């Protein structure tokens, strides 16, 4: 026959104290590696609760990070435009006066700022598309890989002006293979491929519009030669800037884990 004290221990009374549990916001603050945060309310939307939006302690930190990344990408675009412009001037591809330094700051002064703005837009667009598609890019997420990607892109641009090919088809196929090789080596994402093709198409159309209206000129009388390598340069440039934008969006680089 069961005893009375067995029932008392097996079935707790209604007045028994429940085990104490920490609020959900305090648990997220304790797990956040960037420091303690503010406990979040229970009625917050699902996308804003702990574990879904990272460890941002201040509401304005996201905007501050966005401005910083935009400035870095804009500066990179301006510097890269100046460097590539110097390479093309040395190969007599673009039509400029003999004074190279004066050319950079007088003729076509709007080109570097436009390239910087385009770099900022593209660099911010890549991680946004990755987040929207739910496919975070994790292939070669390190600054050393980004630096190698920049070097390969500059090499492709230099080869497009330096190497001599028998016809435009051979030039286009060679540069297309190099550009796809750059994407396969440093990106390998569907979003990166799609954005690169879109950027190449739109940028080539804008360049043709500027040339046909006399805003921008090339030394080569055959513009078909220029159009044969422009899409490849824009494609590889979009992939390169996208890798920089993704790396900047990471914040603190993650250490590789071996499972």
Swiss-Prot record:
Record InterPro entries: INSIG_fam
Localization annotation: Endoplasmic reticulum membrane
Motif, KxHxx: chain positions: 253-259
What are the recorded GO MF terms, alphabetically?
oxysterol binding; protein sequestering activity
Q: Which residues lie on this side of the membrane: Extracellular?
A: 90-108, 165-167, 214-227
Q: Provide the positions where the record notes the PTM Phosphoserine.
A: 189
Task: Enumerate the UniProt keywords alphabetically.
Answer: Cholesterol metabolism, Endoplasmic reticulum, Isopeptide bond, Lipid metabolism, Lipid-binding, Membrane, Phosphoprotein, Steroid metabolism, Sterol metabolism, Transmembrane, Transmembrane helix, Ubl conjugation
Give the transmembrane ranges: 67-89, 109-126, 142-164, 168-186, 192-213, 228-245
Asked if the Swiss-Prot or TrEMBL record annotates the protein with the keyword Transcription, the reply is no
Q: How is it modified after translation?
A: Phosphorylation at Ser-189 by PCK1 reduces binding to oxysterol, disrupting the interaction between INSIG1 and SCAP, thereby promoting nuclear translocation of SREBP proteins (SREBF1/SREBP1 or SREBF2/SREBP2) and subsequent transcription of downstream lipogenesis-related genes. Ubiquitinated by AMFR/gp78 in response to sterol deprivation, leading to its degradation: when the SCAP-SREBP complex becomes dissociated from INSIG1, INSIG1 is then ubiquitinated and degraded in proteasomes. Although ubiquitination is required for rapid INSIG1 degradation, it is not required for release of the SCAP-SREBP complex. Ubiquitinated by RNF139.
Q: What happens when the gene is disrupted?
A: Knockout mice with a conditional deletion of Insig1 in the liver and a germline deletion of Insig2 overaccumulate cholesterol and triglycerides in liver: despite this accumulation, levels of nuclear sterol regulatory element-binding proteins (SREBPs) are not reduced. The amount of HMGCR is also elevated, caused by impaired degradation of the enzyme. Knockout mice with a germline deletion of both Insig1 and Insig2 die within one day of birth.
List, in alphabetical order, the GO biological process terms annotated in this UniProt record: cholesterol biosynthetic process; cholesterol homeostasis; cholesterol metabolic process; cranial suture morphogenesis; inner ear morphogenesis; middle ear morphogenesis; negative regulation of cargo loading into COPII-coated vesicle; negative regulation of cholesterol biosynthetic process
User: Region Disordered: start and end of each range?
Assistant: 36-55
The principal localisation class reads endoplasmic reticulum
Q: Which domain of life is it from?
A: Eukaryota
Q: Which residues lie on this side of the membrane: Cytoplasmic?
A: 1-66, 127-141, 187-191, 246-259
Q: Give the membrane topology.
A: Multi-pass membrane protein
Q: Where is this site: Required for the recognition of 25-hydroxycholesterol?
A: 153
What remark about domains does the record contain?
Answer: The KxHxx motif mediates association with the coatomer complex.
Q: What does this gene product do?
A: Oxysterol-binding protein that mediates feedback control of cholesterol synthesis by controlling both endoplasmic reticulum to Golgi transport of SCAP and degradation of HMGCR. Acts as a negative regulator of cholesterol biosynthesis by mediating the retention of the SCAP-SREBP complex in the endoplasmic reticulum, thereby blocking the processing of sterol regulatory element-binding proteins (SREBPs) SREBF1/SREBP1 and SREBF2/SREBP2. Binds oxysterol, including 25-hydroxycholesterol, regulating interaction with SCAP and retention of the SCAP-SREBP complex in the endoplasmic reticulum.
Family per record? Belongs to the INSIG family.
Instruction: Relate the assembly described in the record.
Output: Interacts with SCAP; interaction is direct and only takes place in the presence of sterols; it prevents interaction between SCAP and the coat protein complex II (COPII). Associates with the SCAP-SREBP complex (composed of SCAP and SREBF1/SREBP1 or SREBF2/SREBP2); association is mediated via its interaction with SCAP and only takes place in the presence of sterols. Interaction with SCAP is mutually exclusive with PAQR3.
Q: What is this protein called?
A: Insulin-induced gene 1 protein
Recorded source organism is: Mus musculus
- Encoding gene, per UniProt annotation: Insig1
């Amino acid at each position: 026959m069961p005893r009375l004290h067995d029932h008392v221990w097996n079935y707790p009374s209604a007045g028994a104290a429940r085990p104490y549990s920490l609020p959900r916001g305090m648990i997220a603050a304790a797990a956040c590696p960037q420091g303690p945060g503010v406990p979040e309310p229970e009625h917050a939307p699902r996308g804003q609760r702990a574990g879904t939006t990272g460890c941002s302690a201040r509401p304005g930190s996201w905007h501050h990070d966005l401005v910083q990344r935009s400035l870095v990408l804009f500066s990179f675009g301006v510097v890269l435009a100046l460097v590539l412009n110097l390479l093309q001037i040395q190969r007599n591809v673009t039509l400029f006066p003999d004074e190279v330094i004066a050319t950079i700051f007088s003729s076509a002064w709007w080109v570097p700022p436009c390239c910087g703005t385009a770099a900022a837009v593209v660099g911010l667009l890549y991680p946004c598309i990755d987040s929207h598609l739910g496919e975070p890019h994790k292939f070669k997420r390190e600054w050393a890989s980004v630096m190698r990607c920049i070097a390969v892109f500059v090499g492709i641009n230099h080869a497009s002006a330096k190497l001599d090919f028998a016809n435009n088809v051979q030039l286009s196929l060679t540069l297309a293979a190099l550009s796809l090789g750059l994407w396969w080596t440093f990106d390998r994402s569907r979003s990166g491929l799609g954005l690169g093709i879109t950027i190449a198409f739109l940028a080539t159309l804008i360049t043709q519009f500027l040339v046909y209206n006399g805003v921008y000129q090339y030394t080569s009388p055959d513009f078909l030669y220029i159009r044969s390598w422009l899409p490849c340069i824009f494609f590889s440039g979009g992939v390169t800037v996208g890798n920089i934008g993704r790396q900047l969006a990471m914040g603190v680089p993650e250490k590789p884990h071996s499972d």
